[in-house]
């Protein structure tokens, strides 16, 4: 069994049925100015039970491609919105 990549991010949009868009933040050192800057990337996550809401913090795990741009599925909700 292979080790699947996990990403942690915040839900920013519910993109249709069983799909949520999350934004993942990473911090990198700027090559010239040596300052830590934030970089963001959006991923589509498969939500089988339609349980996610905008603002939730989640952990997603890599899986086989479910569509052209969707290759992650929901693993757990870390912090839910009330």
UniProtKB/Swiss-Prot annotation:
Pfam families: Ribosomal_S17
CDD domains membership: Ribosomal_uS17
GO cellular component entries: cytosolic small ribosomal subunit
Keyword presence, Lipid metabolism: no
UniProtKB keywords: Ribonucleoprotein, Ribosomal protein, RNA-binding, rRNA-binding
SUPFAM superfamilies in the cross-refs: Nucleic acid-binding proteins (SSF50249)
A molecular function (GO) term: structural constituent of ribosome
One biological process term in Gene Ontology: translation
Subunit structure: Part of the 30S ribosomal subunit.
Main function: One of the primary rRNA binding proteins, it binds specifically to the 5'-end of 16S ribosomal RNA.
Protein family membership: Belongs to the universal ribosomal protein uS17 family.
Protein name in the entry: Small ribosomal subunit protein uS17
Organism: Sulfurimonas denitrificans (strain ATCC 33889 / DSM 1251) (Thiomicrospira denitrificans (strain ATCC 33889 / DSM 1251))
Organism classification: Bacteria, Pseudomonadati, Campylobacterota, Epsilonproteobacteria, Campylobacterales
Gene that this polypeptide is encoded by: rpsQ
